[in-house]
Each structure stands twice: as C-alpha cells, then as structure tokens.
Amino acid sequence: MAKLEEKLTEMLEPGVEALGFELVGIEFVRAGKHSILRVFIDHENGITVDDCADVSHQVSAILDVEDPISTEYNLEVSSPGMDRPLFKEKHYIESVGEVVQVRLSMPMDDRRNFKGKVLACENGMVSIEVDGQQFQLAVANIEKGNVVPTFD
C-alpha cells in the first residue's frame, strides 16, 4: 500500500467504523487532472446505495478538514464487489480456497503477476498455487490483489 493510501486509511477508518462499516481499503488513482479516490466499504448485511452516500458524506467532511490531497479528485464510495480488492493480510486469510490475481511491487522469479488459488496465509505470507506450482508471496510485496469471480 502506498504512503498516501496508508495515511488516508488511518485518517478515514475511525469515521467509517463509527457509521458501522468496515473500511476494506482505499485506492488513489492519479489520472492527470481527474484523479479518483476510491473508498471500499463492507458490512455483514451488505452495502446499499444509501450506505455509500452516508459514508461519502462522512469521508468528505473528514477530507475537507484534514485536506490531505493537494490535487483535484473525485470521491467514489462502493462495496468491494465480486472482484473484491485485497488490501490486508486479513483479506487473504478470508480468501483461502478462492482464485486471486495479484501483482507484485518487486518481481519474484522474474514474475510480477500471479493468478491462482490461495492455499494459506499466515505470518505475512500468502501461499498461492499457480498451474500446479506453489508460490510464497509476501503480503507487503503485493501491489494489487483481487479475487477472481468464478461462476459455477
């Protein structure tokens, strides 16, 4: 997770949790003048559009006071969706048995991209099976991770 996302997570998590939601993670996508701040939230009963609106108002109020982003951006608040992003070790633990796609910050064995089944996750390491081969990936080295939806 990049420094800005870490700072924003620390800043916004208490406000999101105060509304009864889990802050799954944050993505800040720089795209010239049109940057996007994506805030992913979840709840055991699911997420509604009204939930997203409530969290958006809360997050906007916090950001207006703290003003941590110097460029213009659009705020998007949503549920993680079927292709749920994986930000924390906890998310990989919850994804054991599922297929995930990950991109590493630093290559391992000349590879940065891995798509496979999560076998286990403990002590900051994710065990992923890719085409019958097992890889041990450090959560700290994962730049981006998502669950790959399967339709059986």
Curated annotation (Swiss-Prot):
Keyword Membrane in annotation: no
Protein location: Cytoplasm
GO BP of this protein: ribosomal small subunit assembly; translation
Alphabetic keyword roster: Cytoplasm, Ribosome biogenesis
Top-level taxon of origin: Bacteria
SUPFAM superfamilies listed in its UniProt record: YhbC-like, C-terminal domain, YhbC-like, N-terminal domain
A GO term from the CC aspect: cytosol
Major localization class: cytoplasm
Function recorded in the entry: Required for maturation of 30S ribosomal subunits.
Family, per entry: Belongs to the RimP family.
Protein name: Ribosome maturation factor RimP
